């Protein structure tokens, strides 16, 4: 019954969207995409086969603080005084810059998550691009190992603050590392955000310094739709009240996430779940992020997201774990070809953890189709027949 109701609502949204488009046409508005919007063609279509079998044995110690080493080369703190935080970062630089373009995927996780949520995806990207790329992820304020420089100061968690943090971290990454490791004419940045991280990416792009923004070839967001996200916030308090904040062991935490369907791949859960918890001296796993304390800022997180995303003056990719939750703004944008939409029907909310291989293939295709440094123009000029 719930599925039928969802389908009816979805059909109504399409009908409403079509009426809006007809009105726009009657008024003489151009329904074609902006010149700076996507012109991508079709990205890879994936079957609806089952998720890879879950592994029942871990290849690394549970809750091992060094588990990140399998996926990233460096774990470094970025101390940024103007943001009053030391940001815990993970990154991997290209093995070689012997290519026309070197993409750097800069990632932002969602609320209650951590930078290591992208670990499985990072591994897939780096492997498939044969080391000719950079990968960067980090823990946002209030998450993971990121900590305030001065803990006596108030710590806000509104969208504007998260966005300012993200841009400060990107600027630090560029000035401290990228400009010394990747020739500027080869650097291509893809911003990727999951859930709240997607909302942050849509605001961060326009707020970036122009020189750095010019290096961004596209913005990708994973499983986030404004209307659905705002509706979910209404149930957030109940969800938090019924979700354990601690477990007797880290193994118990991992098994809970798998059994509840919060993680669909055991291999991903082994690295992603421990990053959400602090391990006490007695082995107890205690959740790091207290989302309830963010409650007065929740209302800032998603309002206007769909419109911001659709109108970003760059290439855009939306990857969803199911298609029933598009809102009217996104439906109209999709009809007008404003962005690329890919749906992974078999994935859970954490697409980067549940379907890292498919997500990597999709991101690589998105980058290749939108990075003009990959275009090779062949000519016979000056050649004799």
From Swiss-Prot:
Name of the top EC class for this enzyme: hydrolase
Keywords of this entry: Hydrolase, Serine esterase
Catalytic activity: [phosphatase 2A protein]-C-terminal L-leucine methyl ester + H2O = [phosphatase 2A protein]-C-terminal L-leucine + methanol + H(+)
Taxonomy, superkingdom: Eukaryota
Single GO MF descriptor: protein C-terminal methylesterase activity
Gene3D superfamilies: alpha/beta hydrolase
A GO term from the CC aspect: mitochondrial small ribosomal subunit
SUPFAM superfamilies: alpha/beta-Hydrolases
Catalytic residues, chain numbering: 195, 223, 349
PANTHER family documented for this protein: PROTEIN PHOSPHATASE METHYLESTERASE 1, PROTEIN PHOSPHATASE METHYLESTERASE-1 RELATED
Biological role: Demethylates proteins that have been reversibly carboxymethylated. Demethylates the phosphatase PP2A catalytic subunit.
Family the entry assigns: Belongs to the AB hydrolase superfamily.
Protein name per its UniProtKB record: Protein phosphatase methylesterase 1
Organism: Eremothecium gossypii (strain ATCC 10895 / CBS 109.51 / FGSC 9923 / NRRL Y-1056)
Name of the encoding gene: PPE1
